[in-house]
Amino acid sequence: MTADQASTSGVPHLVLDPRGLDHQGEAARLRERGPVVRVTLPGDVHAWSVARHDLLNQLVLDPRISKDWHNWGAMQRGEIPDDWPLIGMVKVTNMVTADGAEHRRLRKLVSQTFTARRVEELRPRTTEIVDRLLDALPSHTAPDGTVDLRQHLAYPVPMQVISDLFGIPEYERPELREAVDKIFRSDLAPEVVAANQVAVYQLLARVVELRGRERGDDLTSALITAREAEPDALTEDEVVGTLLVMLSAGHETTLSLIVNAVRALLTHPDQLALAKSGDDMWPAVVEETLRWDAPIGNFPFRYPTEDIEVAGIIIPKGDPIMAPYSAVGRDAAQHGPDAGGFDIGREQVRHLAFGHGIHACLGAPLARLEATIALRKLFARYPDLSLGADPDTLGPVPSMFSNSVTELPVRLGQVA
């Protein structure tokens, strides 16, 4: 028996679906197997999944847990090939995969430039974008009378907001959209993943070079200006890497959040009625959606820097740990016996959908702002909005990370 077999003997196990065909079903199976589950990823790579809210919350705050992939034992032993399908999600160097002083250095400049004030300044532009997209929805009606809300609202809202935020010129945006679509896919061939990484990096590098010459009122220009005032803060490559992190997380999370919220409301008419009651329940809709149907179902990885015990199970030093946000979002031990229900009136909604601790998502306030504006205005403009297809037939995004559907056909009804 190998050391790995000895450490996992008798431990619950689950093979995760790289296609993400059933995030919530898989999340339920994780919870059924116990708080700590050994999981198999594509390429027969093994990791751990901690499927209980309180335990995952403790882990992300534990100083013995690292985000740095250099602490992944299998990676250091040469057991993870460069063409592993998920390598692009893991083997990167940025503020998400850094610890300690290095993490503080990488995050400091972003925290100074991507402020609450800058997010609030995006409110009028976000409102303008949403209004324009809502105006155009009837023109996108298909022959069967439906409109794909993912394609024509949920997708372009964060894409346009982030493009404006970064100062990305119009002529670069079509290529950006094509590249972003592939970032969270876990069903692509390794060579496609690698080529896409290069493409999106080169595009953002061009944006940084442009804003270095032509400053604007955008985050990229602000980062470059701050970097010039403090040269040791970030290298030019790190500025590009920072933009890539914010783009990857900011777009996909907000897109899926809007889609999941609309789908939840249209399949829970009592909750939709409550949301439209006039008491401004839209922020509560956003928070309950983040808990009940987290936009990111699973998120890699953390690594113990020593053997740790979690719920009576030893996770060896250097083993990767997955954060299963879909699973912990419906953890009855945290959210009560009705954790599986969608209830926007739920008190004290506490979720981990945006992470927690020093690595919590910097873009969470912007995602909340975009989603709240989009939802409030959508249902005010189209109060009779209804689903245009059986919700059980909507195909999932092919990703073990992103949790959403590839289309959201709706019938608009009368315009208010």
Model-derived features: where do they sit?
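Cytochrome P450
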Residues: 1-416
